[in-house]
């Protein structure tokens, strides 16, 4: 299983989130998921909201084009990015 797949023009990411980190960044793979470190704390949905903004900026879309499909209360998350305008330099990530 890959950490990403395309669904039409949308990108689906399988992520492993590390909240309350020292920096915000993509830091490679964690098993079959993309590991993302965020400075936001894991309380009251703050890390999830911060993740949406982080991904929107990284993929060149608005926050409304990023949605959490699963993993609201878990570090393992599935996220949909609607028609990304740019692709960050991540292992194996390319357009279909």
UniProtKB/Swiss-Prot annotation:
GO terms for cellular component: cytoplasm. Pfam families: DUF167. The lineage of its organism: Bacteria, Pseudomonadati, Pseudomonadota, Gammaproteobacteria, Pseudomonadales. NCBIfam families: DUF167 family protein (TIGR00251). SMART domains: DUF167 (SM01152). This is UPF0235 protein Pfl01_5322. Coiled coil: none annotated. It comes from the Bacteria. Belongs to the UPF0235 family.
């Amino acid at each position: 299983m890959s950490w990403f797949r395309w669904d039409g023009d949308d990108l689906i990411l399988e992520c492993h989130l590390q909240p309350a980190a020292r920096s915000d960044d993509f830091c490679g793979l964690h098993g079959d998921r993309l590991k993302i470190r965020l400075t936001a704390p894991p309380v009251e949905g703050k890390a999830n909201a911060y993740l949406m903004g982080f991904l929107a900026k990284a993929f060149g879309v608005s926050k409304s084009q990023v949605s959490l499909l699963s993993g609201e209360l878990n570090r393992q998350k599935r996220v949909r990015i609607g028609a990304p305008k740019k692709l960050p330099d991540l292992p194996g990530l390319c357009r279909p």
